[in-house]
């Protein structure tokens, strides 16, 4: 079984960039729990978190993940294909609301763009920017716009954290272990 999963990963990593991101967008939005059960958006038990981080191999095998898992697959694709990229962790944490997002920004055809995942409606070339700084500003502004929409008058800039990250995650770590690593 491990050979087939590795073969699948190699096949995915060798796709042309547009086909790779079409594949990424097709991954079902959800997560694998500590018991290796899958939970999909819309399931009754979706919010009963016992999250377990999925490696790129597990993500492909399960065809299920969310931005934390998918960002690692995208970073691996970029590394394997010589694509410059940076990864960012965005978090809003208040007493009443907690939301996170990880996002990979990549330079493809000399333009920076937010890499598509299974939760955003972006395309690799739309929008695109001349510099990483412009792309990062768009990402941060878009996240703040989303938060203001959700929180209305309760949005507080001091509750927002945005940082570049480059840590390595072991398979099957918990949500708390993931957050402890990425927040460092």
Language-model-derived ranges and their functions:
Residues 1-62, 66:
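Secondary-structure boundary elements
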Residues 40, 46, 125, 156-157:
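Intrinsically disordered, low-complexity, compositionally biased regions/tails
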Residues 69-148:
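Hydrophobic/aromatic-rich core segments of domains that either
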Residues 9, 86-89, 175-177:
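Terminal low-complexity, poorly structured segments
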């Amino acid at each position: 079984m491990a050979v087939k999963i590795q073969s699948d990963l190699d096949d995915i990593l060798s796709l042309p960039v547009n086909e790779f991101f079409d594949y990424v967008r097709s991954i079902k939005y959800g997560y694998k729990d500590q018991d290796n059960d899958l939970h999909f958006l819309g399931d009754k038990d979706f919010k009963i978190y016992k999250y377990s981080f999925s490696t790129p191999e597990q993500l492909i095998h399960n065809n299920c993940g969310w931005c934390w898992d998918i960002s690692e697959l995208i970073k691996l694709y970029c590394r394997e294909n010589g694509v410059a990229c940076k990864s960012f962790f965005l978090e809003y944490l208040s007493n009443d609301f907690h939301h996170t997002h990880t996002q990979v920004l990549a330079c493809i055809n000399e333009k920076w763009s937010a890499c598509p995942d299974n939760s955003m409606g972006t395309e690799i070339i739309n929008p695109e920017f001349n510099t990483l700084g412009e792309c990062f500003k768009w990402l941060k502004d878009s996240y703040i716009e989303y938060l203001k929409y959700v929180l209305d008058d309760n949005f507080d800039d001091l509750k927002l954290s945005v940082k570049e990250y480059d840590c390595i995650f072991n398979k099957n770590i918990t949500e708390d272990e993931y957050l402890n690593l990425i927040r460092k």
